[in-house]
Amino acid sequence: MRQTKTGILLANLGTPDAPTPEAVKRYLKQFLSDRRVVDTSRLLWWPLLRGVILPLRSPRVAKLYASVWMEGGSPLMVYSRQQQQALAQRLPETPVALGMSYGSPSLESAVDELLAEHVDHIVVLPLYPQFSCSTVGAVWDELARILARKRSIPGISFIRDYADNQDYINALANSVRASFAKHGEPDLLLLSYHGIPQRYADEGDDYPQRCRTTTRELASALGMAPEKVMMTFQSRFGREPWLMPYTDETLKMLGEKGVGYIQVMCPGFAADCLETLEEIAEQNREVFLGAGGKKYEYIPALNATPEHIEMMANLVAAYR
């Protein structure tokens, strides 16, 4: 009996190819055209997206990307490539491909890369620790579209999320401990997750529950009292209500109430990106300090640290 050859597909959101208005516009158009991300009526959404949002937001967002751009590309791309390469070194007999829901490299190119290696089983690991229809669901949809065009379909193992995986929780906890040791223990540890519209949760997306699970498990691993750990949601977009409490409003409130020192971690981001390095590490620092806070530290994402790569290897091992 022929032995199954397994490949691993690491999936993440994506990034513009360059910090320019043109590249950002292409990326945002693809991202914001996905019904998993914005499910507004197309008759209403297309004119707003093409006539208002893309022309106005693209130049502004391009400047933000330029402020965090690295020699090898956007932070998300640099760290994602490092993750892919490190996992491939950790699992030398297993092909590892990287694909993005939006932009390059595409999920389709990643699938084709693995099929060219003659794999007959693919383990798909969306690098979103907490499931949401707008992220993991988008990977699932695109994968289904890709495979619908293939004459032969490999076996697929799809990892829904890993919000309470103990290797993941331990890696987060060790990162927090290292930050506390380096910068001193704060008055409060704030865990900021990417938000989604409240309506999505009301309609069945269990993302907020998965975020609460990670928060509870991490606080337990750290042995921290509940009042010393707070969960918030960032990056809201548009006018409808998103998951609350909002990160920026919470930081402003805490600064005004006299909380002096906060450390912030974003457990939902497997790799640092615009939303962590610019929005959290810079914009929200200014919000907190401007409201009266005294000290603010951002705890980096796990990125391609050895402990994170070992977690990935252990996670996919159960499906190989």
UniProtKB/Swiss-Prot annotation:
* Keyword Ribonucleoprotein part of the UniProt annotation: no
Q: Entry's InterPro entries?
A: Ferrochelatase (IPR001015), Ferrochelatase_AS (IPR019772), Ferrochelatase_C (IPR033644), Ferrochelatase_N (IPR033659)
Entry's Gene Ontology cellular component terms = cytoplasm
Quote one Gene Ontology molecular function term.
Answer: metal ion binding
Per UniProt, where does Fe cation bind?
H194, E275
This enzyme catalyses: heme b + 2 H(+) = protoporphyrin IX + Fe(2+)
| Name of protein | Ferrochelatase
Q: Which organism is it from?
A: Shigella boydii serotype 18 (strain CDC 3083-94 / BS512)
